[in-house]
Amino acid sequence: RSLEAIAAHPRLLDLDWSRVHIWWGDERWVPAESEDRNDKQADDALLSRLPLNPDKIHRMPAAGAGIDLDHAALSYADELYRVHGGTARRTPEFDILLLGVGPDGHIASLFPGHAQVYDKAEGAVPVYDSPKPPAERISLTLPTINRAKHVWFVAAGPDKATAVHLALRGLWFVDLPASGAKGTLSTRWFVDELAAAELDDDLRAEYEENA
């Protein structure tokens, strides 16, 4: 729904979209034509309406394209390194990284207690055991997410209330990956009243003051 809201913004086309690079935080390991792919949903909600440069839309590889999941993640990491440039294996400093939050506090396809949460390298990793179907996915690592200048969280509904509360309280990121995502310049939370229902008054006041 957040992408639909962006698509409906009256000043949407004021931006020079030809200069914008589009990346994915994660992707489901399904065929390119699958309705379950995040990029298909993003196309339908927003991207198909924008005058984007096709060379700057960086889709994650799809299943059934002659590449296995491990190599698909490596391929996406290589694309990140290529766009960043230089000899170091660094990923771009994203201007804005938009993240949803699961009821369990997962972000992208980094799930509580799973091995990928511990990964300290910049790049992308394969996921074989997602608690949510499909089990196989590709995800940016947490250090890659934390290269973003601005991290924007979007959470709505009562099932997100506990995750929002614990993330803002700073629960250990291994147990709640959302608490480990921080922009280098800013981190913002966009939540509805239901998702904010468990916030203490002092925490709510702190974030409203800094909004």
Language-model-detected regions and their locations in the chain:
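Ligand-binding beta-strand-loop-alpha-helix segment within the catalytic cores
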Residues: L13-D95, E209-A211
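Short acidic/glycine-rich loop or secondary-structure boundary segments that cap or lie
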Residues: P31-E33, D68, D104-F111, V117-D119, ...
